Amino acid sequence: MENSFKAALKAGRPQIGLWLGLSSSYSAELLAGAGFDWLLIDGEHTPNNVQTVLTQLQAIAPYPSQPVVRPSWNDPVQIKQLLDVGTQTLLVPMVQNADEAREAVRATRYPPAGIRGVGSALARASRWNRIPDYLQKANDQMCVLVQIETREAMKNLPQILDVEGVDGVFIGPADLSADMGYAGNPQHPEVQAAIEQAIVQIREAGKAPGILIANEQLAKRYLELGALFVAVGVDTTLLARAAEALAARFGAQATAVKPGVY
């Protein structure tokens, strides 16, 4: 049950990922064999639920790619369910301050360190109590990544970085650029300056900086600055643009798409 993704971040080994938005175990398994270090199963902006997350975790399990799951909110009940079906690494959205980061960590820990409910006899995570001493080992294998996506969160970053149990901080460029007044333009110089400063600050604090960006030049720039978990594409975008390009080569008139974060 060792969390190899958490171990890689702790060792300072950059992890390259892909975002999964199709909410399909079939496509998740297809992409699990593509060679990415991690795959993000998105529960915030897709029609995923606990059941569909479970089937994607099962589909990815035989492959080297490590799953990361984003719940729809920093909700301890939802987090408990996601952990019980086998999630070990969580990306918690819209964390604004240290108290919210602390709540996210507590939701992943069994008492007395946290508030995770004990239901291991019902849980895939413990292999239905077939993993020896699961309740004693589980806390140490949980990896908590929190998202900062607003100016308020950026202001509170030093305090968030001080929270014990936060393994990494993920910068959300789409929401951050919108909050800064540049919606749809994460490449604006002010947004980029904030992102770069945050990456350096997170790494200097001994935490893992992360981000999603489909621009390869920017992705490489963030890695150079010290980012440790970088998603470089989204399955929905890859499929849509490839299909449009193929159709266009045979004369189809595709709808113009403005380049964005993904």
Swiss-Prot record:
Name the chemical reaction catalysed here. 4-hydroxy-2-oxoheptanedioate = succinate semialdehyde + pyruvate
Record-annotated residues binding a divalent metal cation? E149, D175
UniProt EC number: 4.1.2.52
Q: Which cofactor does it need?
A: a divalent metal cation
| GO biological process entries | 4-hydroxyphenylacetate catabolic process; phenylacetate catabolic process
Q: Which GO terms describe its cellular component?
A: cytoplasm
The signal peptide here is none
Q: How is the cofactor bound?
A: Binds 1 divalent metal cation per subunit.
Spell out the InterPro entries in the cross-references: Aldolase/citrate-lyase_domain (IPR005000), HKHD_aldolase_ent (IPR023701), HpaI (IPR012689), HpcH-HpaI_aldolase (IPR050251), Pyrv/PenolPyrv_kinase-like_dom (IPR015813), Pyrv_kinase-like_dom_sf (IPR040442)
Role summary: Catalyzes the reversible retro-aldol cleavage of 4-hydroxy-2-ketoheptane-1,7-dioate (HKHD) to pyruvate and succinic semialdehyde.
State the HAMAP family in the record: HKHD_aldolase (MF_01292)
Which protein are we looking at? 4-hydroxy-2-oxo-heptane-1,7-dioate aldolase
